[in-house]
From Swiss-Prot:
UniProt name for this protein: Polytheonamide B
Modification 3-hydroxyvaline (Thr) occurs at: T113
Chain positions with D-serine (Ser) modification: S138
A biological process term (GO) from this entry: defense response to bacterium
Modified residues (D-asparagine): N140, N142
Chain positions with D-threonine modification: T144
Record-listed 2-oxo-5,5-dimethylhexanoate modification sites: T97
């Protein structure tokens, strides 16, 4: 759910905002198709100034048409290893709300850096900073409480 100023606070909100922008703005859609990494980096920085997508992160855009529907199958939680947050990471997340961007064609289990860990597909993973990434692409956003 987006907060009162329409800032996305969940994966669904983030994806919806990008899709709506692409449908309204042909130039934005063109840029999203030709350089999704650049566009997602801009959107991420708008939400979390200074946040960076990992250099080795692959990003793909998959458009549906009348003959194709894309189902994102999350990574099995048994294939996700736990990572630990440093004290600095916890300090950055002290505000209690963080949006984790998981970019994954095959998705991935996700947990936000925030006041707790969210579970997706039964797996926990903590990553550094306000973004969560499990290589490949499709954007996941979660809100901590």
């Amino acid at each position: 759910m987006a907060d009162s100023d329409n800032t996305p606070t969940s994966r669904k909100d983030f994806e919806t905002a990008i899709i709506a922008k692409a449908w309204k703005d042909p130039e934005y859609l063109r840029r999203l198709r030709s350089n999704p990494r650049e566009v997602l980096q801009e959107e991420l920085e708008a939400l979390h100034p200074g946040a960076q997508l990992p250099d080795d992160l692959g990003i793909s855009i998959h458009e549906e048409d009348e003959n194709h529907v894309h189902l994102v199958m999350p990574r099995h939680p048994q294939n996700v290893s736990d990572q630990t947050l440093t004290d600095d990471d916890l300090d950055q997340a002290a505000g209690g709300t963080g949006i984790g961007v998981v970019v994954a064609v095959v998705a991935g289990a996700v947990a936000n850096t925030g006041a707790g860990v969210n579970q997706v597909a039964g797996g926990n993973i903590n990553v550094v900073g306000n973004i969560n990434v499990n290589a490949n692409v499709s954007v996941n956003m979660n809100q901590t409480t």
